[in-house]
C-alpha cells in the first residue's frame, strides 16, 4: 500500500539512527507477481538488516517474517497496524496524567479492520479500558475478540463491545475513529457504510457525551473532515456530507490531538 506518515516515520527514524533506507514502490516490486513472497524474503533478508512491510494481507508479512531471517516490521495490513499503536499509546500517555492501565478510551466506527483490532490488542496487553462501538455487523471477528479477552484476563484490561455509542464514550479520556471506507475498497462501499455508521460520527455532541471536559479526539489519519480534498468534495456532492467520520469542528478543536498522534 502507498503511504505518507508510516513511510516517513520509518525513514526518519532509520536515518536518525544512522541506517540506510531503500524504498521498494508497490508498482516497481515483483513481490507476489513474478517472484513468490518466500523467495523475495530470502533474497531481501540477505541484503538488509531489517524489512518494513506495508500491504493488504497479514499472511504476507507473516510469510516475510518466517523466511527473511531478519526482523520484519508490520507497517500496516488489513488486519493490524502495530507500529501505529506505539504512537497511539505514547500519545495517550503524553496527554493524560493517568498511568496507562487507568486510561479509558473508545473507538467508534467500522471496527472490522486494523485500527480497531490493534487498539483492542494494545488495551488488552497494557491493561487499559477500551470500548468498541459499531453496528454489530461491523464488529471485529470472533477470533480477535476471543484473543484479546484472553490477554485482558491476565493483565486486568477491560473490554466492551457495544452498538450504543453513548454508552461507549461515557467517561472516556480519548475518542478514536478511522475512515469508514478503507484503501482498496470500491466507491460503491460508501453508501452502505454511511447508512450503517451515520450515528457513529464524531461530532461536538458525541465529544460532550463523554462527560469529561478533558476528553481528546484521536485519528491515525488521513481523515475526511471537510471538502478540501478530491475525495472529500466527491463525498459532499454525492452524499451531502461535509466531513464523514468526524466533523471539521471536532477535528480542528483544541480537543484534537491527531497531529501529535500521527
UniProtKB/Swiss-Prot annotation:
Q: Specify where it is mainly localized.
A: cytoplasm
Give the catalysed reaction(s), semicolon-separated: carbamoyl phosphate + L-ornithine = L-citrulline + phosphate + H(+)
**Family matches, as InterPro entries:** Asp/Orn_carbamoyltranf_P-bd (IPR006132), Asp/Orn_carbamoylTrfase (IPR006130), Asp/Orn_carbamoylTrfase_sf (IPR036901), Asp_carbamoyltransf_Asp/Orn-bd (IPR006131), Orn/put_carbamltrans (IPR002292)
- Top EC class per UniProt? transferase
Which sites bind carbamoyl phosphate? Answer: 3-7, 30, 54, 81-84, 219-222, 247
GO MF annotations in UniProt: amino acid binding; ornithine carbamoyltransferase activity
Places the protein is found: Cytoplasm
Note the site residues: Important for structural integrity: 94
What does the UniProt keyword field contain?
Amino-acid biosynthesis, Arginine biosynthesis, Cytoplasm, Transferase
- Give the signal peptide as a residue range, or say none if absent: none
Which residues does the record give as L-ornithine binding sites?
114, 178, 182-183
Q: Which SUPFAM superfamilies match?
A: Aspartate/ornithine carbamoyltransferase
Q: What does the UniProt record say this protein does?
A: Reversibly catalyzes the transfer of the carbamoyl group from carbamoyl phosphate (CP) to the N(epsilon) atom of ornithine (ORN) to produce L-citrulline.
Read off the PANTHER family from this record. Answer: ORNITHINE CARBAMOYLTRANSFERASE (PTHR45753:SF2), ORNITHINE CARBAMOYLTRANSFERASE, MITOCHONDRIAL (PTHR45753)
Q: Name it.
A: Ornithine carbamoyltransferase
Q: Please give the organism.
A: Neisseria flavescens
Amino acid at each position: 500500500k502507498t503511504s505518507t506518515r508510516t513511510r516517513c516515520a520509518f525513514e526518519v527514524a532509520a536515518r536518525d539512527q544512522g541506517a540506510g533506507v531503500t524504498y521498494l514502490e508497490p508498482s516497481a516490486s515483483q513481490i507476489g507477481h513474478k517472484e513468490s513472497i518466500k523467495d523475495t524474503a530470502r533474497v531481501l533478508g540477505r541484503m538488509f538488516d531489517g524489512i518494513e512491510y506495508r500491504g493488504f494481507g497479514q499472511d504476507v508479512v507473516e510469510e516475510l517474517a518466517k523466511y527473511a531471517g531478519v526482523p520484519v516490521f508490520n507497517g500496516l495490513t488489513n488486519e493490524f497496524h502495530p507500529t501505529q499503536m506505539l504512537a497511539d499509546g505514547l500519545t495517550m500517555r503524553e496527554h493524560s496524567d493517568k498511568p496507562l492501565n487507568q486510561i479509558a478510551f473508545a473507538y467508534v466506527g467500522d471496527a472490522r479492520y486494523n485500527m480497531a483490532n490493534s487498539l483492542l490488542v494494545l488495551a488488552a496487553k497494557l491493561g487499559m479500558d477500551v470500548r468498541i462501538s459499531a453496528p454489530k455487523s461491523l464488529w471485529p471477528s470472533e477470533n480477535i475478540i476471543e484473543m484479546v479477552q484472553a490477554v485482558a484476563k491476565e493483565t486486568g484490561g477491560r473490554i466492551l463491545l457495544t452498538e450504543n455509542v453513548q454508552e461507549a464514550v461515557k467517561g472516556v479520556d480519548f475518542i478514536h475513529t478511522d475512515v469508514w471506507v478503507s484503501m482498496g475498497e470500491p466507491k460503491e462501499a460508501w453508501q452502505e457504510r454511511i447508512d450503517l455508521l451515520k450515528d457513529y460520527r464524531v461530532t461536538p455532541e458525541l465529544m460532550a457525551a463523554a462527560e469529561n471536559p478533558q476528553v481528546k479526539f484521536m485519528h491515525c489519519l488521513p481523515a475526511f473532515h471537510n471538502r478540501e480534498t478530491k475525495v472529500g468534495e466527491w463525498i459532499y456532492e454525492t452524499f451531502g456530507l461535509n466531513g464523514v467520520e468526524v466533523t471539521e469542528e471536532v477535528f480542528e478543536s483544541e480537543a484534537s490531538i491527531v497531529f501529535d498522534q500521527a
